[in-house]
């Protein structure tokens, strides 16, 4: 790596250290070209190009390519958010019906978006409707209800929605979906978010996880009862309490308050998050169940999805998991920061 490339990488590490939370794609092709979502990174690149006697054409996202419509609202039951502009690209997370996404860039039928948890990924335009910022704010103000095992009957057919999907509840008891279609609830229910949050505060987090997602299959990048991964589960359960967590396990590990590690779980509270490594990197998270039983609630591929397991069990897999426990974090009643 030559000096110029090192300087570019230094700028990336300073201003966009986590590529999941921002954009920094810069190449040297006669000059500096590319795109970034960081104004500070763009300004640093301009200074670097000037000092090196190079031209600079690094776009600051979002820009004119996005145009007037800067918000995308998910109109499908859920939208896979992918790592690239290919249908077979890795699913890095999901956005649920009614969630609003900030549009950062466009590429043919693909939108680069920032999710409410700040995760940056690509979504196909077919999953969303787009509009200006005021349009997105209007929907957010009206969509104060959440689906709970709901199916909605519309003139066009029945629509099934995942837990947590956002809808607008109308005075006559019908609901408005994110695409403006109105329908009647025929299965499950749609509840005000405030009511659900108040109920969630009366449940232990592991119990809430089991009630809402117990038996859900494991799905990398999943966030719903139709398929969910380990950090998607912990993020969703804490969100039900109104506590925002980052999307991935290593990001969640940087949040919350540290709890001292214990050989037998002494000092852990129900709902504490336990973090595990694989090849030196945090890659798994589980909820401590509490009650002195030594159990965890998690979504794991070896057990097919969301379930309860004995962390101190004698099975070789649990022995390995215990050996890879690197930290415990507590979030309830704490300020959830990233410092």
Predicted segments with their positions:
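Structural motif
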Residues: 99, 165, 271-272
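Boundary regions of SH3-family modules and the immediately adjacent low-complexity/disordered segments
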Residues: 22, 43-68, 86, 107, ...
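Aromatic- and glycine-rich peptidoglycan recognition patches
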Residues: 130, 137, 192-193, 261, ...
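Short alpha-helix capping/helix-loop boundary micro-motifs
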Residues: 84-90, 150-157, 254-264
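Short glycine/threonine-rich beta-strand-turn micro-motifs
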Residues: 21-46
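Active-site nucleophilic cysteine motif
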Residues: 221-241, 245-248
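Short, well-ordered loop/turn sites that connect or cap secondary structure elements
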Residues: 89, 95, 161, 267-269
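...with weaker cross-activation on analogous glycine-rich loops/strands in unrelated enzymes
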Residues: 245-305
């Amino acid at each position: 790596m030559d000096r110029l490339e090192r300087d570019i990488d230094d700028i990336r590490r300073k201003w966009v250290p986590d590529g999941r939370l921002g954009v920094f794609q810069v190449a040297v092709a006669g000059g500096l070209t590319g795109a970034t979502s960081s104004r500070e990174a763009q300004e640093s690149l301009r200074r670097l190009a000037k000092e090196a006697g190079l031209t600079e054409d690094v776009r600051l996202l979002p820009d004119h390519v996005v145009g007037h419509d800067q918000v995308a609202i998910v109109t499908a039951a859920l939208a896979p958010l992918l790592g690239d502009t290919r249908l077979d690209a890795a699913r890095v997370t999901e956005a649920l019906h009614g969630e609003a996404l900030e549009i950062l860039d466009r590429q043919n039928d693909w939108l680069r978006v920032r999710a409410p948890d700040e995760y940056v990924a690509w979504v196909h335009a077919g999953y969303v409707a787009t509009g200006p910022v005021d349009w997105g704010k209007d929907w957010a103000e009206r969509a104060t209800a959440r689906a709970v095992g709901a199916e909605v009957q519309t003139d066009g057919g029945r629509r099934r929605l995942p837990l947590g999907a956002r809808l607008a509840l109308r005075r006559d008891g019908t609901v408005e979906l994110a695409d403006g279609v109105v329908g009647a609830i025929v299965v499950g229910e749609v509840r005000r978010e405030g009511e659900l949050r108040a109920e969630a505060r009366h449940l232990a987090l592991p119990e809430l996880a089991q009630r809402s997602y117990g038996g859900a299959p494991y799905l990398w990048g999943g966030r719903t009862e139709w398929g969910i991964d380990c950090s998607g589960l912990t993020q969703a359960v804490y969100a039900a309490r109104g506590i925002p967590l980052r999307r991935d396990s290593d990001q969640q590990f940087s949040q919350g308050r540290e709890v001292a590690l214990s050989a037998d779980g002494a000092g852990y509270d129900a709902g504490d998050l336990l973090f595990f490594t694989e090849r030196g990197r945090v890659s798994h998270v589980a909820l401590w169940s509490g009650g002195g039983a030594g159990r965890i609630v998690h979504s794991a591929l070896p057990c097919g999805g969301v379930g309860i397991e004995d962390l101190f069990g004698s099975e070789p897999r649990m022995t390995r998991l215990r050996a890879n426990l690197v930290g415990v974090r507590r979030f309830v009643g704490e300020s959830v920061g990233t410092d």
